[in-house]
Structure formats: C-alpha cells, structure tokens
Amino acid sequence: MNVAVRLKAAAVWLCRIGHSRGFGIQSPTDYWMVRYVINEHWPYYQYETLGRHDDWLTRKMGRLCFRLANWLQPSVVESRDYRNYLQAGCRKTVFGESSELVVMPLENCSQDRLSYIYNKVSPRSVLVVTGISKVRRLWRQIVDDERTGITFDLYYCGIVMFDKKRHKRNYIVNF
C-alpha cells in the first residue's frame, strides 16, 4: 500500500479521535447505530471470504455496506458498488431501483438525482453517499436539506436517514 495514503488515513483518524465509538452522542438510538452498525469491530461470518483482494478502503466501505444490509434486511438495494458485500449482508436482497437502501458515489451526483431520491424515501430509508471528502459542498447541502434527518459524516462516506420523527442531527464519526 502507498505510504502517503496510509499516512493520510492515520492523520484523518487522529483528527477525528474525539468522535470515536460514539463518544458525545446523547441519543441511545444514534449511539447504538454508531457502536453496533457503523463501528462494529467483531468479525462477522462473511468477513473471511469477502474482499480478500480489495484494497483497504474498498474493504472498509464494503464491510460497512455489509453491516448496513445485515441490519436493515432490505428487499431491494440500489447500488453499483459493493454488491458482493450487500448480497452477503442480506441474501434475499435484489438489486434495482430502491428506496430502502441506496449506495451511490457523490462525485457524479446531480441535484435532480438527489431530489428524485428524496421524493421516494420512507422513514426507514438509508442513503449512503461515498466520496464526501472530495465534494464537501454537496455533502453540506445534503446535511442542511430539510428533507433529510439524521446524518453521519464518516469522512470517506456519509449516511443519511430520513426519519422525520427524530430531531435533525449531523454526527461526525471516526470510522
């Protein structure tokens, strides 16, 4: 692995150390989400076989998608990437247009695409956007949009939830 990439990853992790493992999160539901879905460290049954030949970031993001699919158990997932991980997390999942779990890169995303997603989501929907560190302005727009609810900034990706019964919050998480 490239030494510069590893050093940058270590620097990002150190800058976010105060946001580790749910520290500072007062909501029990959000704390549970950070501890037992986002930052779960116990090895899952599929970890040995999944992503054996992937680079460290693809494997890290794939394992997050695996845990999200395992937690949500969606019937349909919309994603171009991480399909093996998502399928392993929920075997009954099929891929197509979905409002349950959407995984998409933010770099090539338009406002029209986001509006389309916002108009079809339910309170149980989860949107995972990758590459938020490259397009911070667009990520801030997603966080600030009144149609989104709880958001988690993981530096490499963002997780958006749409349950409007809960107070709108943005959490920075050391992932």
Walk through the language-model features, giving the residues of each.
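A short alpha-helical cap/connector motif
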Residues: 1-125, 132-175
